[in-house]
Every structure is written in C-alpha cells, then in structure tokens.
Amino acid sequence: MAKATSSLVVPIIFLVIFALVEQNTGCFDYDVYQPCDHCRERCLKYYPVTRKAICRKNHCVCIGPCPDDKAIPDVKLFKNVKEQILS
C-alpha cells in the first residue's frame, strides 16, 4: 500500500506545479523581423496600453496580460445583473 501511495505523489506534485505556472505566466506576442526602433509605439498600435514593450535579440516583444484575464470583470457584471433581476 505504501508503494502505491508513493507512486502517486510525484504525478500530483507535477500537476500542481504546471497548474501554478500556467496561471502566473504572462502572454508574449513577438513582432518578429522588425528592429527595435520605436518598439513602444508598435506595441501600442497592435495591443492595449497594459502591454509592456521590450527589446529581445533585436526583436520587439510586447508583454502583458492574457486575453483571458479580461473575462474576470464580466463575471462580476453577470452577478450584478442577477441581483438586479432578483430585486
């Protein structure tokens, strides 16, 4: 019984680690084949203001929140609608 329990510990640890890493990483959008001149302006042209522009290996990189992060306020909105209907 102890051997069966110990064989489950490692996969469970990896599942927890992968779940946490996926939640904490930001989204990267590479603007490849473009030099780093005016990188911030290029990020503002294609992405929202919440993105940060940096230069990596002579390529402009726009880093910021994932599109899924915008869904969180929508949940609060639906909650308020439900409260309005019930009142």
From Swiss-Prot:
Keywords on record: Antimicrobial, Disulfide bond, Fungicide, Plant defense, Secreted, Signal
Signal peptide: 1-23
Main location class: secreted
GO annotation, cellular component aspect: extracellular region
Source organism superkingdom: Eukaryota
GO biological process, one term: defense response to fungus
Subcellular location: Secreted
Record-annotated disulphide pairs: C27-C66, C36-C55, C39-C60, C43-C62
Annotated family: Belongs to the DEFL family.
This protein's name: Defensin-like protein 176
Species whose genome carries this gene: Arabidopsis thaliana (Mouse-ear cress)
Gene: LCR65
